Amino acid sequence: MVICYLNPQNLRTRKMEKLSKIGRYQFLAEPFHCDFTNHLFMGHLGNHMLNAADFHSNERGYGMNYLNTINKTWVLSRLAIEMYDMPKAYEKFYVETWVDSVMKYFTSRNFKVVNEEGHVYGYGKSIWAMIDMDTRQPTDIFAVREGLINEYIETSYECPIEKFSRVKVTGEEELLRSINTYYNDVDVNGHITSVKYIEHLLDLWDLDWYRTHFIKRFEIAYVAEAHHGDQLNFYREHREIERENDFNFKITKTTSDNTEVETCRCRVLFNSIL
């Protein structure tokens, strides 16, 4: 299997050409993107994965650079990240990414995080929708460039983590925190950026917790968009009573008219490290 080795620093406009189905992009765990344990923040890893997805799709002709010219865009619907360990400060690592299935309105994209020696830090899975920028409704992926994305589906490269789980809330969830949203929370599509939900949610635990716990798996499923000025409310309950380190979350937004609407659901699974 051939993997395309490309550095995002050297991307440039090029004639349309058939590239490999798998992209590989180098990143650096910059120290100001690492936590007090000297490891990369989960939020920054998620951001690197989204950047890799953007590089990969743009190079192959169905990314944001082209979609924006026809008033369409990609939006992240679901993301799951499962890690064995995290890159340390100043370590170089690669995010590999590939599309493993496509439907009319959604596509499935996988990730692998690995260093130069082949050590695997972890994997990710994601679901994306293509939407119309005016109506905000899903649009036909196969109608873009005569279904060009079909030429880049890779089904044999391994991504050995669990599929997305169902995040249930029972009505017994506890409100832990409410926060306001500001300029730095908003992305290019005009809504609260995907990674900000991850960062705000992981702030719900203090440093003492992170001294003895490692984020093994993080899942997020987006339900509705939140926008600048909305208040975000974080509700938590244990996923299973016997698993004290496994949590389900419901995040809602409170709008200017005091309406509370669910925006996403999350799961966070920790491993004890002591």
Summary of predicted features, one role per range:
Residues R14-Y25, A80-S165, Y222, A226-H228, ...:
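HotDog/MaoC-like acyl-thioester-processing domains
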Residues E173, R177-R267:
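Acidic/His-leaning functional-site neighborhoods
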Residues M1-K15:
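N-terminal amphipathic/basic-hydrophobic helices that include classical n-h-c signal peptides
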Residues S77, T107, K216:
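Exposed loop/turn and edge beta-strand positions of beta-sandwich/beta-sheet ligand-binding modules
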Residues R14-L76, Y123-K125, D132-F214:
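Hot-dog-fold acyl-thioester-processing enzymes
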